[in-house]
Amino acid sequence: MDVPEPQPDPDGGDGPGHEPGGSPQDELDFSILFDYDYLNPIEEEPIAHKAISSPSGLAYPDDVLDYGLKPCNPLASLSGEPPGRFGEPDSIGFQNFLSPVKPAGASGPSPRIEITPSHELMQAGGALRGRDAGLSPEQPALALAGVAASPRFTLPVPGYEGYREPLCLSPASSGSSASFISDTFSPYTSPCVSPNNAGPDDLCPQFQNIPAHYSPRTSPIMSPRTSLAEDSCLGRHSPVPRPASRSSSPGAKRRHSCAEALVAPLPAASPQRSRSPSPQPSPHVALQDDSIPAGYPPTAGSAVLMDALNTLATDSPCGIPSKIWKTSPDPTPVSTAPSKAGLARHIYPTVEFLGPCEQEERRNSAPESILLVPPTWPKQLVPAIPICSIPVTASLPPLEWPLSNQSGSYELRIEVQPKPHHRAHYETEGSRGAVKAPTGGHPVVQLHGYMENKPLGLQIFIGTADERILKPHAFYQVHRITGKTVTTTSYEKIVGNTKVLEIPLEPKNNMRATIDCAGILKLRNADIELRKGETDIGRKNTRVRLVFRVHVPEPSGRIVSLQAASNPIECSQRSAHELPMVERQDMDSCLVYGGQQMILTGQNFTAESKVVFMEKTTDGQQIWEMEATVDKDKSQPNMLFVEIPEYRNKHIRVPVKVNFYVINGKRKRSQPQHFTYHPVPAIKTEPSDEYEPSLICSPAHGGLGSQPYYPQHPMLAESPSCLVATMAPCQQFRSGLSSPDARYQQQSPAAALYQRSKSLSPGLLGYQQPSLLAAPLGLADAHRSVLVHAGSQGQGQGSTLPHTSSASQQASPVIHYSPTNQQLRGGGHQEFQHIMYCENFGPSSARPGPPPINQGQRLSPGAYPTVIQQQTAPSQRAAKNGPSDQKEALPTGVTVKQEQNLDQTYLDDVNEIIRKEFSGPPSRNQT
């Protein structure tokens, strides 16, 4: 058999396996022609028109001849680097790259070339051993690493976990780690194929000065190749190459371990290997511009390379979505010492690689610079939809954390709410469509206040709708809807065992998105109820909310997280016409006495609908239940008129929160609604519809006692009486005593506004101190009784208060005060003697004789220092005569008058009031 003459090396070198006396098999090794001869220096320029033969002896297609081989000059300056640096493999050999030499011709498919090693090189004990046998003693490890790894300057690319989820097809539907850039299996246009309107020469003009190793290498089907394998990047492997295993990909490509030829202890191991970006930005690879690892020499060649790659990654003319990448705050330099972990130095630990806007960072990963590759998108994206790019160095709040929908100028708002009922579908049945809006469309969400031109990602998940803090629902998850009518791009992902749907928010749409791709999936109750720590019951927890969350990056590096939740959605499989539903209530609180009317608006109300109030403890035990009275005459199918029941405890000191629900039958009840009972304030008020708002006293802010004073609450009165006949404001003065026998002096003249009370005492009387007095009052005589009344201007000798209304005189109570009355001076409240005056009191009421009395005040002689006496006139109460009479009933001015000579008759009147109070039954109009 004639042995052909060995062809000379295209670069003028003999190759590592060419030694004198070498076997013919070594000379016939064609791998030296294909980028695997890197132990000899560059001697001459390659011949562009030289034919290249395949290992089988058949010529490659003609388009291979369109490209010549040129030496790699940009990285030639790396030759001075010591072993173990990134440039060291390039310094010991030459590199080839492809350059277009064919003149521009007819437009057609661009050539795709894969220079692969020979078949013999892949077999253990083949030509590789023969070549290694001829190496010098100081170069065996270097040649071993170089032959199998084809050293080149590359970017680190993670393991296969970053490209696909378990049990899911890769973006290219292939088990091969390199097939994701194949146009045959990838959902995207292959980065290796140039645009149709470009000539063959314009495949990659930016790469004309870059070695061929930086271009994507897509091997033809059934062609052996060396590439990163997705299943063996992190394990310890033998330095001896082993026979390659068959791949499960459709193309039946060979795959070889990236670590089987890269030995960790070898100081000359190849640096990180990666496919570099293609002329079109790849959907899986992005380049970061500031993450050159420490230890890489800042040479001119590296600058040219990085600039070219950055241009490709940033200036993208196509519509493939942009990627995110993570910048480590302190990238770890590549160590030159041998690795102790047994791993190749260029392999990073396994980390999770996140999709667009996904911020779930691996907490335990070491600081590093890595590429973030998004997971597969189930459907092909429409052109020109870039997805947001957010650094993931900062941890984001988990889904269980409650977030506000507004922060600063940003606000996430649900413009169109979903329908209150949506039939969720089970895992074993078909989809029931996306959640719809009451108007017939779909919910709409918009982010307000965002002024940047970068898109963001809107996350959607299903949350709870009960009285507890909003969190992901245990029995329902979001479901991605696809179809011809779906216009919103979306994809699913898992965040903390919760399925999340992510859609883009784009500035061109004013950061507004229509949610037409989100359905609701019902999980099996048994699967969730048997989960450890789960206490909810699936059949009783059928109400959900659509929760929307967005993360807004700020120029300062801070990330603002906003969250908005929709109205409750009933997902029960029962008919929506069976269960009553409360959509609105006109009031959510009242006093413990109840009695007020509440209007409920909703759906599916019937004539038999009942409203039940109940209270539960923190541990879920029911301690109170009361059925409210429903006005069946006024009630409608969508409206109920309910009288609020009285709370079980009328002496509460703090507000109590209870729930109520509408029930149509045994199991047809609405979701619980919230209601609050407030304690009785220090001063109660008349119903607000009987008086003008201008006549209602303002809420008091303090009191002499320890009981709190709550704001004015409208309530139904048991009787129409009031302390003051026309609900005119009453004021109170506080005076203090220095000693029991000292003269009374006005210490702090202040007025107190109070409204209505069944009993007045210093411990219960709330008051405030408005500036009502023109001058302080002085009480000089301790034995002087004071008559305080309202009359015409200039009648009194005290200070005059501001005018209030017209001067019609009506009956009004008279307040007597005498410090000499021993019955009133006794008790522990002697220091707080109160002088009260009332409006709407005529001068004719000041008379020497005892008046006719029809009502009095409950007073304890030893504890209460004030006495209130009311007189009546033939005229009716001003409050009963309408607004016009009410305005006329008020006096023009209020005067505090000090009478100089009062006889004992007034003291007798005081004693008579007390005797009648305690001897006879209380009158109907008593306050």
Curated annotation (Swiss-Prot):
Consequence when changing R423A: Decrease in binding to DNA
PANTHER family: NFAT (PTHR12533), NUCLEAR FACTOR OF ACTIVATED T-CELLS, CYTOPLASMIC 2 (PTHR12533:SF4)
Sites bearing Phosphoserine, chain numbering: 23, 53-54, 56, 99, 107, 110, 136, 150, 170, 173-174, 176-177, 179, 182, 215, 219, 223, 238, 245, 257, 270, 276, 278, 282, 328, 365, 757, 759, 761, 860
Reported effect, R112A: Lowers dephosphorylation
Record's protein name: Nuclear factor of activated T-cells, cytoplasmic 2
Outcome after substituting T428A: No change in binding to DNA
Effect after changing R164A: Induces aberrant nuclear localization of the phosphorylated form
Free-text domain note: Rel Similarity Domain (RSD) allows DNA-binding and cooperative interactions with AP1 factors.
Region of interest: Required for cytoplasmic retention of the phosphorylated form: 163-177
Intracellular or extracellular location(s): Cytoplasm; Nucleus
Annotated gene: Nfatc2
This protein's record includes keyword Transcription: yes
